[in-house]
Structure formats: structure tokens, C-alpha cells
Amino acid sequence: MGDLNTDLAELRADVASHVPAEIAEVLKADREGFVGVIAEAAAKPGTAMPDLTLPDASGGRVPVADGPAVVVFYRGAWCPYCNLALRTYQREVLPELENLGAKLIAVSPQLPDDSLSTKDLEFTVLSDVGNELGRALGITFRLDPATKPTFDTLIGDVEKINGAEEWELPYPTVLVVDGEGVIRFIDVHPDYTTRTDPADILAAVKAL
């Protein structure tokens, strides 16, 4: 396995070198505001996964508490850090999960559309419109309005992309849910340029 967070750090440096200096400064300040943040309201191991169903890109509905499963929250298809992490999980986690009898599910607040299936992902991608599941798990936050013009410039209107009035996103988070729908592992990353290591995910699944 490679080192996902090393790859993410290299991506962060690459992004900073390819955007105008004023945008790079906003992104740097935005990220630094999350470094060291602890998601104290996040669900704890041993609690039940909310009994919700979410839509996939084809319009079907999938129960998120139907384990054993690894549930990965990401910000959206527009986020390069998310795309790198999801591709890594597909390559390094998904094959092992199939051998262990567990599923891999990715969740973002982005509206279900073709963009959710354009990253060559071979696992289920769900849409948590309005962040209902994310809020229930205590892993959402509202973005700083001062950063909105920068994000609008880079990716477009997040509110439009997500189909919601609130400018709200989930922290990148990985949960492992057992066969009874109970959360056995949760790892929340307020710093959106870091992610859960694939080895830690697999260890949590093997411990079920």
C-alpha cells in the first residue's frame, strides 16, 4: 500500500502552485482553521447507525445501516482530495472488503446525477441531500461565508451543486458498521486534506 496522506500532502502543494496567489492564501487560511479541530459532537463507537435510506445515482435507495459496511463521507465530486482518497480506497480497500464480506459506500451531500458515477468508482455512491445523515452523525459544519467567493470561483455554487440553501458540508469521515447496524469505528477529519489510512479501515473491519 502507498501512503495516502503523503499523496494528499503532495496534492495540496500542487493545488497551491496552480491557482492564483490570492486564492492560494484563502485556501491555506481555510484549511488552517480546521487543523486541530475535534469533532466533539460526532457519533461514538457503539451507537446505532441512523436507520436511513439514501438515493444513488440511478435513483434507487440504499439503507446505510445495512452492514457490515465501510461508509465514507466526502465533500463532493468537485474536491480533488476526496477524489484521490476514493480512488485509493477503491484500489487498496475494496478488494479486501469483498473478501471479508463487507461493502464500501461513499456519501456526499451532492445531488444525485451523472457526476457521481464519472470517477470510475466500482462501489455504491449515495447522496445525502440536506446533510440529514451527516447531521445525525454530528459530522457537518457550515463553511465560512468569507470563503464562499473563492469556492464559487473554483468549483461553482456549492448550494446549487448540493441542492440546499445551507452552505454546509460533512467533515471527511470513515465509519465501520457491523452486521447489526452498530458503528464500531469512526474517524473524522476536520482537516479536509487528510484522510483515514486504508490499513486502519481494514483493521477495523477485521475486528468485527
Locations of the language-model features?
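Chalcogenol-based redox active-site neighborhoods
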Residues: M1-L208
